[in-house]
């Protein structure tokens, strides 16, 4: 928007704000904190007036252009200017040329640019038009400028520097020793810094400071960055706190579930107690002599190792001692031959035929060696189940035969006693003679058989065995 400018401003050809007289400060504002704004404006006006008086219009124009570039009102131009300043700085730092050569080159370039400008912009074409516009009109930006101007930044920096100098003077007056120590330490620091860091780097840092400080100061970039970082930190803090609280809640819930599970396991263990495998194996072990080592196999069975074999009722170990005892006492029992030949006197006294007895004795003498060999083998070797059954059946037959013989003997004795009481004495003599005849005849036949077979010694042994067997049967059947 353009509007007619005042005549005094147009005739002088400078901004209106520069020629305005400084407004006198109010005492209340200077004393209070509210007077900081007017003081800055007054300082900015004074700085602008001093620059105008010292440098003139061209330099002042360059200052305003630098203000626009350094305030980053137009970011693209400011960025290009920043890159150009960096290139120029490193060119001056790395080139072997001297300073006056560079200054002459810069002046020559400025002259060439001015000549070109004069050739392009003819005074005859646009000078009058340009002068009329600048005299009658003034360009006014209707948009309020919220950004601080470079002059204001310079004024604020000057005020801060002046306040720092005043404070340092007061500190020097109050404690000169501390002030001297502070100045010496600062000078020593810069000396060490200059010895380690080249001056080129320090100059480049000053250039960066000149470009970036207005950017952060005038555009409030630092405040914006601080607000964003603060919001991020707050979100991060809130997120970390929420995460920690969530972990605490999960841990407390896990502890509660664990305690509840432990209580339930205790209840179950009280109802269903656990049985140890070793205790169960010891209880299941059958042997009473030595505890076997028990191991639990993969298929769920017990494995007995390095122990005695469990004893059962059907085991051969139980049968073996009984067989030994039975075979040891077997010689005391009468055999079939002994049972039939034990009561020779009784048979003779009863009047049995002697011829049958003679034939039986011959058969017994023929079969006795084989039976003795079998009995010796039975005593020396362990008996099998069928042999034991056969032996028991033979023993049962012998016992039955002996019992029947004893019963018949008792009956015959009773009948003989009755006959002896009734019969006369003469009859007894004749019977006695007939018995003697039979005995003499029997003895002669026996001697003949013994001479033929040569069994005199066997007969003596048989007589002794018959006596023993008769004594055993008499003892066994004495109660009948």
UniProtKB/Swiss-Prot annotation:
Widely expressed with highest levels in brain, lung, liver, muscle and spleen (at protein level). Detected specifically in organelle-like intracellular structures of the small and large neurons of dorsal root ganglia (DRG) (at protein level). Predominantly expressed in sensory and autonomic ganglia at embryonic day 14.5. Phosphorylation at Thr-134 by CAMK2B enhances oligomerization and membrane scission and reticulophagy activity. The modification Phosphoserine is found at residues 132, 136. GO terms for biological process: autophagy; collagen catabolic process; endoplasmic reticulum organization; mitophagy; negative regulation of neuron apoptotic process; reticulophagy; sensory perception of pain; white fat cell differentiation. One of its GO terms (molecular function) is endoplasmic reticulum-autophagosome adaptor activity. CDD domains: RETR1_RHD. The modification Phosphothreonine is found at residues 134, 340. Keywords: Autophagy, Endoplasmic reticulum, Golgi apparatus, Membrane, Phosphoprotein, Transmembrane, Transmembrane helix. It is a multi-pass membrane protein. The chain crosses the membrane at residues 43-64, 76-93, 99-116, 192-212. Homooligomer; oligomerization is enhanced following endoplasmic reticulum stress and is mediated by the reticulon homology domain. Interacts with ATG8 family modifier proteins MAP1LC3A, MAP1LC3B, GABARAPL1 and GABARAPL2. Also interacts with ATG8 family modifier protein GABARAP. The LIR motif interacts with ATG8 family proteins and is necessary to target the ER fragments to autophagosomes for lysosomal degradation. Belongs to the RETREG family. This is Reticulophagy regulator 1. It comes from Mus musculus (Mouse).
């Amino acid at each position: 928007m353009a509007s007619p400018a005042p005549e005094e401003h147009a005739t002088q050809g400078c901004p209106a704000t520069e020629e305005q007289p400084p407004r006198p400060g109010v005492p209340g504002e200077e004393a209070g904190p509210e007077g900081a704004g007017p003081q800055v404006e007054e300082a900015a006006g004074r700085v602008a007036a001093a620059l105008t008086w010292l440098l003139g219009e061209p330099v002042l124009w360059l200052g305003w252009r630098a203000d626009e570039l350094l305030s980053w009102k137009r970011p693209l131009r400011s960025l290009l200017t920043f890159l150009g300043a960096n290139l120029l700085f490193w060119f001056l730092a790395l080139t072997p040329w001297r300073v006056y050569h560079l200054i002459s080159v810069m002046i020559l370039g400025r002259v060439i640019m001015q000549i070109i400008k004069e050739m392009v912009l003819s005074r005859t074409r646009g000078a009058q038009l340009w002068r009329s516009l600048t005299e009658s009109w003034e360009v006014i930006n209707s948009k309020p400028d919220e950004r601080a101007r470079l002059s204001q930044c310079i004024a604020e920096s000057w005020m801060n520097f002046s306040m720092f100098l005043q404070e340092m003077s007061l500190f020097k007056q109050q404690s000169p020793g501390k002030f001297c120590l502070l100045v010496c330490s600062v000078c020593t620091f810069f000396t060490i810094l200059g010895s380690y860091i080249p001056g080129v780097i320090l100059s480049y840092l000053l250039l960066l400071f000149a470009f970036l400080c207005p950017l952060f100061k005038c555009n409030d970039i630092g405040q914006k960055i601080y607000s964003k970082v603060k919001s991020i930190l707050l979100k991060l803090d809130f997120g970390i706190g929420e995460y920690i609280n969530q972990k605490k809640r999960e841990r407390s819930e896990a502890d509660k579930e664990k305690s509840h599970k432990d209580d339930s396991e205790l209840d179950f263990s009280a109802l269903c107690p656990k049985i140890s495998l070793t205790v169960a194996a010891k209880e299941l072990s059958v042997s009473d002599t030595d505890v076997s080592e028990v191991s639990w196999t993969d298929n769920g069975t017990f494995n007995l190792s390095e122990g005695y074999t469990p004893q059962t009722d059907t085991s051969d170990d139980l049968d073996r001692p009984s067989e030994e005892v039975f075979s040891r006492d077997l010689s005391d029992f009468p055999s079939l031959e002994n049972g039939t030949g034990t009561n020779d006197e009784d048979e003779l006294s009863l009047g049995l035929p002697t011829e049958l007895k003679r034939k039986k004795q011959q058969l017994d003498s023929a079969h006795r060696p084989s039976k003795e060999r079998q009995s010796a083998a039975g005593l020396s070797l362990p008996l099998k189940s069928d042999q034991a059954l056969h032996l028991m059946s033979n023993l049962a037959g012998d016992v039955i035969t002996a019992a029947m013989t004893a019963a018949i003997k008792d009956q015959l004795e009773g009948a003989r006693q009755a006959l002896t009481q009734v019969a006369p004495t003469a009859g007894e003599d004749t019977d006695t003679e007939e018995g003697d005849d039979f005995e003499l005849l029997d003895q002669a036949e026996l001697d003949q058989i013994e001479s033929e077979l040569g069994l005199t010694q066997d007969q003596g042994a048989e007589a002794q065995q018959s006596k023993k067997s008769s004594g055993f049967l008499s003892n066994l059947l004495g109660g009948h």
